[in-house]
Amino acid sequence: KPRILCEMLEITDETWRNAVEGYLNTQRFYVLVEPEHFDIALGIYEKLRREKKAYGVGLINSGKLEEYDIAPAGSLATVVESKSIYAKRYVNMVLGKVHMCKRVDELKQYPVSITPNCMRYQNHVASAIRPEIYTTPFIGKNAFKVQYEQALQKKEDLNRQKIECKDRMTHMEVTLQWLEWDDDTDVKYRITIVSELK
């Protein structure tokens, strides 16, 4: 049965959640099948591509990952677990080369490294991963719960903004009433009143 990688993983140290989510980025959504089903899945994917129904989805060839049974010490792969040997091997391959650094000044000591707050160093370039990539979690069984809580918070924030906007509109409507006039003689008086309404 095809599975999405992020649903098969758990992060064991929340300090490094953002780094794992951010570094994997779109790879979190790659599809994983058992090695014996890869060719069939690839054929289906190719058919969908020809029909212009699927693009940009990664299909992991799990049969080629035998050498990645162990997560290298100090690597980002050490904080990710999976019940699937194939998912764990893939994570070991991708995150096993990424060294965890607690401070930014340690980054350049390794070819590929990352801090908990997502400052990444790779190919002799330091860069910050955009927060929108990792702010919403997708990895692990609690990811949907966190997404739901984030959605509720966003709804609450939007409702508060809506109330604030309505209050401002009401205030503006009152102010505009004072600007309406029939004769030019009222202009000076009304401008004085408007300034007092602030």
Region locations from a protein language model:
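Hinge-like oligomerization/junction regions that interrupt long coiled-coil arms in large cytoskeletal
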Residues: K1-I163
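Extended alpha-helical coiled-coil "stalk/arm" regions
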Residues: E156-K198
